Curated annotation (Swiss-Prot):
Record lineage: Bacteria, Pseudomonadati, Pseudomonadota, Gammaproteobacteria, Pseudomonadales
Name of this chain's protein: Alginate production protein AlgE
Function: Has non-porin-like, channel-forming properties and probably functions as an alginate permeability pore.
Gene: algE
Span list, region Disordered: 89-113, 323-349
Listed InterPro entries: Alginate_export_dom (IPR025388), Alginate_Permeability_Chnl (IPR053728)
């Protein structure tokens, strides 16, 4: 198996970060290392809703993740690799699933995921001596960036990130840009990630015990270029550029902390999106897509996410949530909200340790021209078991605009025109999810690795969703689609 230059560089940099620093090179008993073993079974039928061939996945995957961590004084370093072997193209990683479950057809294999591959997930060095507070760290390298709700950031990316985390104040500030996937099978970045720089900052304060308010900001600068009129456009070319800024307000009762025992938990956020977007216009000429020009416009959009959760007793909780990302604005879609591009939309909103997709394990919507109403119930028995049952209902905000990315990849016939959705129809569908986990053993991992490793040392988990398409997908599509996973994880 040939390693691409970025993977080689990642491996080399990982060893350099861990061993070339004088304070780390002398570590012996203080270093930590281990191996995460994950076996994933996946069943999916079918993301195309019967509108084209393919779209099914049935198989088993083995995911090995060796890691090493060390610290001495104010310095720390961490690296995690990955080796995957599977019988099909299995999603063993919830952080980098394709939104629609598809691979990019480029005419080569630069964005074609293989059943088996090697990767570098993380490699970073950290320094905690800028202030006297124990929850402060400056970290440089490929690392996990994560917001509690998963709707702003939850990904592995190259970044310079400063975190400040104390009892009464939390803040982070950083800059990030993706340079490679660091995988042997994916040698090209996705077009939307090329030449895109992220600058972000958050601050939140605990204004009364157990209740937080905060401000969030995120800016993306896309320095990529679009094809000129008459040039052929392939699947790896950028189709949009622009500068976008997100500003948000949030308030919550520490609702994403599954250990909190409040009788009533809540979360609420509102986000404004402003900036400018350039979109490439194309037309089909023979077998090629040819650029015809670009459409430029200002962006003025907003989104909100609201939720409440009631604890009935120490084991049972019930709740409801509503989210809306604006849509519309005419031909240029100036009112269409979009997320930052670093989100996973996974969080502990049901009140259990298991992180659940906010917009359905099957549908996997993005908060753009989308509104979602959610009801859920959850159960937790000590640290041994948890379960969540979730119902979602999805609509378009504007029936004439497309939604953001999702886990559905259908092409519908709308009066002889192939579209993603039927023009004018808002009903996207509904979904039922179930997530059940059995935990076997608490892990003995360094506290500073809590962002990189979420779980205890052993578990078995079922994640399953059944989606029923609505009128927006037309009358010729399948009545149901499902996506289900069984994960077995053991950490040595």
């Amino acid at each position: 198996m040939t390693l691409n230059p970025f993977v080689k560089a990642g491996i080399g940099l990982s060893f350099a970060l861990l061993w070339s620093c004088p304070t780390l090179a002398e570590m012996t008993a203080e270093k930590n290392f281990g191996l995460d073993v994950k076996i994933t079974g996946q069943s999916e039928d079918d993301r195309d809703l019967g509108t084209r061939s393919g779209g099914d996945v049935n198989g088993l995957g083995l995911d090995l993740r060796p890691w090493v961590y060390g610290e001495r004084g104010n310095w720390s370093a961490y690296a995690m690799g990955q080796a995957v072997a599977a019988t099909d193209t299995i999603e063993t990683d919830t952080l980098r699933q394709n939104d629609d479950g598809t691979s990019t057809d480029t005419g080569d294999d630069s964005r074609q995921p293989d059943k088996s591959y090697l990767a570098m997930r993380e490699f970073w060095v950290g320094y905690s001596g800028l202030t006297a507070y124990p929850g402060e760290q400056l970290r440089f390298g490929r690392q996990r960036l994560r917001s509690d709700d998963g709707m702003w950031r939850d990904t592995n990316i190259e970044a310079l990130n400063w975190t400040f985390d104390t009892t009464l104040l939390k803040a982070d500030l950083g800059v990030a840009q993706r340079f490679s996937e660091y995988r042997t099978d994916l040698t090209e970045l996705a077009p939307e990630d090329k030449d895109r720089t992220h600058i972000y900052g958050n601050v939140a304060t605990q204004w009364t015990p157990g209740h937080w308010v905060g401000l969030r900001a995120h800016h993306t600068h896309d320095s990529g270029s679009l094809k000129n009129p008459g040039e052929t456009v392939d699947a790896l070319d950028k189709t949009r550029t622009g500068d976008l800024t997100w500003l948000g307000l949030e308030a919550n009762s520490d609702a994403y902390n599954w250990r909190n025992d409040h009788t009533v938990n809540y979360w609420g956020s509102v986000t404004w999106l402003t900036g400018d977007r350039d979109k490439l216009s194309t037309q089909q000429v023979g077998d090629d897509q040819v650029a015809t020009g670009k459409q430029s416009g200002d962006v003025n959009a907003w989104a909100t996410d609201l939720g409440i959760r009631l604890r009935l007793d120490p084991q049972w909780q019930v709740g409801a949530a509503y989210a809306r990302g604006s849509g519309g604005g005419g031909d240029d879609g100036s009112n269409n909200f979009e997320q930052t591009g670093l989100e996973s939309n996974r969080s502990n909103f049901t009140g259990t340790r298991s992180r659940v997709h906010r917009f359905g394990e099957a549908f996997r919507g993005e908060l753009g021209n989308l509104q979602a109403a959610t009801l859920f119930a959850s159960w937790q028995l000590r640290d041994d078991y948890d379960a969540s049952l979730i119902y979602h209902k999805f609509w378009r905000v504007d029936g004439n605009q497309n939604i953001g990315s999702s886990g559905i990849n259908a092409v519908v016939d709308d009066n002889g025109v192939n579209r993603q959705l039927v023009d004018g129809e808002k009903d996207l569908g509904q979904e039922m999810d179930v997530v059940v986990t059995k935990y076997f053993k608490q892990g003995l991992l360094p506290a500073s690795m809590s962002q990189a490793i979420d779980e205890p040392s052993a578990l078995v988990r079922l994640r399953a969703g059944v989606f029923k398409p609505g009128d927006a997908y037309g009358k010729e599509t399948d009545s149901y689609m499902h996506r289900a996973f069984v994960d077995v994880i053991w950490r040595f």
